[in-house]
Amino acid sequence: MLFFLGIDGLSPRILNELIQRNKLPHFQSLTQSGCYGELKTIRPTNSAMIWTSIITGKEAKEHGIDSFIAYRWQNRVIKKSVMKKFMKLGGRSLIQKMIQNREISTFPLSGEMIKVKTIFEIMSDASKKVGVINWWHSWPAEAIKGFIVSDRVNYGRWSEVYGKESPPERLTYPLSLLHAISDLIVLPQEVNLDAYRRFVDISEEEAQEMKTVAFQHHQLKSELKHLLSLDETVRKIALFLLRHFKGLNLFALYFRGIDIISHCALQYSEWNRDTTIEGEERRKYGKAVSAYYCYMDTVLGELLKKVSPHTSLIIASDHGFVQEKNGKFSHRRSKPPGVLILSGGNFKKGKHIMDANIFDLAPTILYLSGLPVAKDMKGKVLKDYIQEDFTNQHSATSVRSYGKREKKTPVSPSPSVDEEIKERLKALGYIDEEM
């Protein structure tokens, strides 16, 4: 089996330093026993766009995902990249006025906007069994050989908790899977006080405040409950499905929390060169980032116990973090590389990864799965890190293209669901304003 773990925002520098301090035993073991290095990324370092490039091997202009949201005007869909160009030409005030007058609306992008086939569909079409959990734009869940738990599954308990309309359609495939995992979904208000104090040094009163505080962009007080609910949901569902689904050829899952907590809390951490941060804030929030890396190491250990020792493991991140000239920690201007670990199974041992980029992962996964690589994919197979016993027995083959994605039955739009998802994206720091 191929085990593909996506961790948003996992930074090479922080990972290396914590490994050197023996804080991350499972990451340390994999980096020492496998191949490890940096993964080159692209600009803009937009998570939705990059993770879609990773599973298609193509750029945004080909796969169709350029942001987290798009615009709707007179029943026409306008991509954010197109809208930005118009605003640069002087149309910003006009667009803002049209949004205020509700002539233009925004909505969160979904898998319906992906124009080309993903590796999940390519493998399924070739009768390979695939399991997917929480990948960007995996909703609506399409029929594949295996299962999909979409990135909107946290909304599967809306009707129970909020008394609102029914949850969105096709949160999982098969549909019956939602019932099986519904008790594993952790909502933000269900995160307990002990979980907060694992990451921050605060009083019980302050922890209670964190549970109810209103959204503030990239403020740890408001975002911690959201990122914990997401990653705990993914962790619980992954462990459950690894027990109950056997014979998978690819198991792919994605965790978001490190990216969000890095945006919120690196400013309080030891990695901040700026000494103007108040001592009390550092005391409360200084351990948040390193503690979250340790949490992810624990999750990794739990997952590894559920898979065969012969599993080929890929761990990748879309970008890292750096402290930029303005003192803020980000990735938008400097395009810091992410992390790539290739370990176990058919991968070599103890080799440093050089010249790998995000577009190489789709071709490499197809090759390891015994499938042709499409010539119109931007990346290459990372053969230098695959054992020669495998490469000698498996010649690389290619096809011209896997073509466009088939048009699926559209999901009925739900304005209230879209608004709730936009609010969640704001709460997680992925969108600032509708512009």
PLM feature segments, named:
Residues 383-435:
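Long, internal low-complexity/basic segments
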Residues 28-29, 120-124, 301, 344, ...:
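Non-catalytic, well-ordered alpha-helical segments in soluble enzyme domains
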Residues 36-55, 133-142, 254-257, 319-323, ...:
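Short, solvent-exposed turn/loop segments enriched in Gly/Ser/Thr/Pro and often Arg
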Residues 322-323, 353, 358-360, 370-402:
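Polar, surface-exposed loop/tail segments
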Residues 14, 105-113, 224, 286-290, ...:
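Active-site rim elements
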Residues 310, 315-345:
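Histidine-centered active-site microenvironments of extracellular/periplasmic hydrolases
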Residues 58-279:
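His/Asp/Glu-rich, glycine-adjacent segments
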Residues 15-69, 131:
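Short, structured active-site-proximal loop/turn typified by the sulfatase FGly-forming signature C/S-X-P-X-R
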